[in-house]
Amino acid sequence: MIVLDTHIWVWWVHGDPRLTSQQNQWLQQYESQGLGVSAISCREVAKLVEYNRLTLPCPVGDWLSQALAYPGVRLLELTPEIAVESTQLPVVFHRDPADQIIVATARTYNCALLTSDAKILSYPHVNLLK
């Protein structure tokens, strides 16, 4: 299994051209093993819609239901272990709580994280597909 950063999940569902060919290959490759989506990504999507930073073709609740039903997608709960890990990441990591939780989720599950976020890509304490 790999863990998807929120924007990767949204781009994949929307067929967004910002996904690189390598990222598309990884999504196909790991589909049978699991594409983990942190529960916090659902909140992130809802907040992006609320702030008009993301437009969806249907109500956000419907979109989430459909996007979570995509082949290989596994919703990963925000467990107490992940919550604590997100506050104790090694070395200084940026302050976005959602990114902290997504990184902690990947670390807790011992899975690679797929992202295009420069701040996460420069963080050496998480396994990344890049």
Q: What is each PLM-predicted segment?
A:
Residues 5, 38, 94-96, 117-118:
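Histidine- and aromatic-rich ligand-binding microenvironments
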Residues 1-37, 51-66, 109, 123:
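Short, well-structured N-terminal submotif of metal-dependent ribonuclease cores
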Residues 36, 76, 129:
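General small-molecule cofactor/ligand-binding pocket signal
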Residues 8, 41-42, 82, 102, ...:
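Alpha-helix capping/helix-boundary segments
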Residues 1, 103-130:
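Acidic, PIN/NYN-like endoribonuclease modules and their adjacent C-terminal/linker elements
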Residues 57-58, 70-116:
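Active-site neighborhoods of divalent-metal-dependent phosphate/nucleic-acid chemistry enzymes
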Residues 45:
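Phosphate/NTP-binding elements of NTP-utilizing enzymes
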Residues 15-16, 48-51, 70, 89, ...:
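Residue-level signal for well-ordered alpha-helical positions
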